Amino acid sequence: MASRWLALLWAPVFLCVALILETASGTGDPSTKAHGHIQFSAGSVNQTAMADCRAVCGLNTSDRCDFVRRNPDCRSEAGYLDYLEGIFCYFPPNLLPLAITLYVFWLLYLFLILGVTAAKFFCPNLSAISTNLKLSHNVAGVTFLAFGNGAPDIFSALVAFSDPRTAGLAIGALFGAGVLVTTVVAGGITILHPFMAASRPFLRDIAFYMVAVFLTFTALYLGRITLTWALGYLGLYVFYVVTVIICTWVYQRQRSRSLVHSISETPELLSESEEDQMSSNTNSYDYGDEYRPLLLGRETTVQILIQALNPLDYRKWRTQSISWRVLKVVKLPVEFLLLLTVPVVDPDKDDRNWKRPLNCLQLVISPLVLVLTLQSGVYGIYEIGGLLPVWAVVVIVGTALASVTFFATSNREPPRLHWLFAFLGFLTSALWINAAATEVVNILRSLGVIFRLSNTVLGLTLLAWGNSIGDAFSDFTLARQGYPRMAFSACFGGIIFNILVGVGLGCLLQIIRNHVVEVKLEPDGLLVWVLASALGLSLIFSLVSVPLQCFQLSKAYGLCLLLFYICFLVVVLLTEFGVIHLKKA
C-alpha cells in the first residue's frame, strides 16, 4: 500500500515534467526575440501603446501589411509561422478567401496531428509509465489516463494563457468544452444507449466540477488569479484523486466482505466485466497492431527498421472502405514522422515494442526534436560558448549513446532499461502536442482578427470542437458497444481534469515564468458570463433531473441536453454580434 501512495506522489511530477521544462526555459531566454511588449505584472498587464490588431481589416489594402508588421499586438509570441503577416503580406487582397481556406485546412490538419499524437504515442507511453510505477487502474485513470485524454485541451490552455491577448481562448475552450461534453456528448450517449447511471460517482464528479466552475467564475469576476488561487486549483484536483481512490478502496472492501450480494445490490460502480473492458481499453490496447511486421521469423536489422517505420498495414488497407483509405493517406506523413521521432513502449507485448534499429535511431532524433520544439526552437539554435549550437551537441551526445545501445543490445530481446524509452517518448510526444497546440492558438487568433471575432467565441466553438471531437467519438463507440456508464463517467472525469489543471497549471507556470504574484484576466464582455452561466445551468439541470429519474437516463434526457446546447449556441452568436447586449447607463 505504501508503494502505491509513493507512486501516486510521483504521478503529478511526471505529468508536469515537459511543461516545467517549457516554462523554465522562458526565464533567461537566450534568444534575441522580443518579448518585452507584453508582460504580466503584479498590478496590471504592462503593454506598449498599440492599436487593436483587429483594426487591420478597416484599413486600405496597401496599408495592411505595414500595420501588422509594425503593430506589436499583431505579433505572435510563440510558434513557427506568422499567420497574420502571411495573409496580409504574401497574399493579394483578391486572394484573401483562398488564404482563409488554406488556413482552415491547416487548422483541421493540426487537430488531426493532435489527435494522432495523443492517441497513438502520448497515451501508450503514459500507460507504460503507470505500469512501471505499479499504479492501480483507478489511480492511473484519474492521473495519467486523464492527462493523456486531455492533452490537446491542456496544452492549448497553457499556450493560450501564456499571452494575455489569447487568455480568452483558454477560458472559452475550457468552458465551451465543458458545455459541449456535458450536453452533446452526454446526451448522445443516453440517446444511443439508455442506462442507469452510477449514483455516487455521478454525484461526486458533478459536485467537484461545479466547484471548479464556481472557482473559475469567481476568478473571472475578480479579474485575476493569484498564486494561492492557482495552487488551489491543483490542490482541488489532488483532493479529487484522493477521493476517487478512497471511494474505490471502500467499495472494494465492502465487496470483499459480501461477495454474494455485490452483483445484485451494487449498481454504484462499474461491473466487473465493464471494469475489465475499461482496463483493456485504457491499458492493454495494442497500439502497434497497425505497424506489426507482415513477415514472421528472424529478420535482419534493416528489415526491422523498414517494418517499424511503415505506418501502413497492407492487409488492413485491402479490407477498408474508401473513406478510411483517404483519411489514412492524409495521416501517413504525420504517422511516419511520429514513428521516426517518438519511441513507444508497450508492456503488454512480449518484446515491449522493442525495435533495436529504430529505438537507437530515436536516441539521436528524439532529443533533437526536444530542443527544436522547446520554446519554438530558440534553444536549439543557441550557441554554447559561441562555438557549437545546442542542436549539434545534442546530435553528438545522442549518436554516442545510440552507438553504445546498438552494440550492447540485440534485436530479439529488449534491454533491461528499455522502460526508460517510455519517458523519452512521453516528453517528445508532449512537445509535439505543445508545438501543434501553439500553431492552433495562433491560427485561431488570426482568424479572429480577420473576422473580428472575440477569442472567447473562437475558443468555445472551433477550439472546443476540435479538441473534443476525438473524445466524443470514443465515448459514442463505447456506448454502442454496451458500456454507456463508462462513457458517461469519462465525460465528467475528463473535464474536471481539464479545467482544474488547465487553469491552475497554466496560471501557475505564467506566475513562475514572469516572476509576478497574479495573472490578470480580461473577460470578453457579456459573452464570458453567458458561457459560464450556460455551463452552470447545464450542470444544475443534470444534478436535479438525473436523481429525479432515479438515475435511469432515457432518450428524452439526452434530447433535452442536445436542445440546451443548440439554444446555447444561438444565444452565444446573438451576443457576439451585438443582438443581445447590456443597456448602457
From Swiss-Prot:
Gene Ontology MF terms: calcium:sodium antiporter activity; calcium:sodium antiporter activity involved in regulation of cardiac muscle cell membrane potential; protein homodimerization activity
Gene3D superfamilies registered for this protein in UniProt: NCX, central ion-binding region (1.20.1420.30)
Residue numbers on the Extracellular membrane side: 27-95, 162-168, 227-229, 347-360, 405-416, 467-491, 547-559
GO cellular component terms attached to this protein's record: mitochondrial crista; mitochondrial inner membrane; mitochondrial membrane; mitochondrion; plasma membrane; sarcolemma
UniProt note on tissues of expression: Ubiquitously expressed. Expressed in dental tissues.
Keywords assigned by UniProt, alphabetized: Antiport, Calcium, Calcium transport, Cell membrane, Glycoprotein, Ion transport, Lithium, Membrane, Mitochondrion, Mitochondrion inner membrane, Phosphoprotein, Sensory transduction, Signal, Sodium, Sodium transport, Transmembrane, Transmembrane helix, Transport
Phenotype of gene-disrupted mutants: Conditional deletion in adult hearts causes sudden death in 87% of the mice. Hearts show substantial cardiac remodeling, including an increase in heart mass and correlative change in cardiomyocyte cross-sectional area, as well as a significant increase in cardiac fibrosis. Defects are probably due to mitochondrial calcium overload leading to increased generation of superoxide and necrotic cell death.
Pfam families per UniProt: Na_Ca_ex
Activity regulation text: Inhibited by the sodium/calcium exchanger inhibitor CGP-37157. Strongly inhibited by zinc.
One GO term (biological process): regulation of insulin secretion
Presence of the UniProt keyword RNA-binding in the record: no
TM helices/strands, residue ranges: 96-116, 141-161, 169-189, 206-226, 230-250, 326-346, 361-381, 384-404, 417-437, 446-466, 492-512, 526-546, 560-580
InterPro entries in alphabetical order: CaCA_antiporter, NaCa_Exmemb, NCX_ion-bd_dom_sf
Sugar-bearing residue positions: N46
Membrane topology, record value: Multi-pass membrane protein
Localization per Swiss-Prot or TrEMBL: Mitochondrion inner membrane
Modified residues (Phosphoserine): S258
Catalysis performed (reactions): Ca(2+)(in) + 3 Na(+)(out) = Ca(2+)(out) + 3 Na(+)(in); 3 Li(+)(out) + Ca(2+)(in) = 3 Li(+)(in) + Ca(2+)(out)
Cytoplasmic topological segments: 117-140, 190-205, 251-325, 382-383, 438-445, 513-525, 581-585
Family under the similarity heading: Belongs to the Ca(2+):cation antiporter (CaCA) (TC 2.A.19) family. SLC24A subfamily.
Function: Mitochondrial sodium/calcium antiporter that mediates sodium-dependent calcium efflux from mitochondrion, by mediating the exchange of 3 sodium ions per 1 calcium ion. Plays a central role in mitochondrial calcium homeostasis by mediating mitochondrial calcium extrusion: calcium efflux is essential for mitochondrial function and cell survival, notably in cardiomyocytes.
Name this protein carries in UniProt: Mitochondrial sodium/calcium exchanger protein
Species whose genome carries this gene: Mus musculus
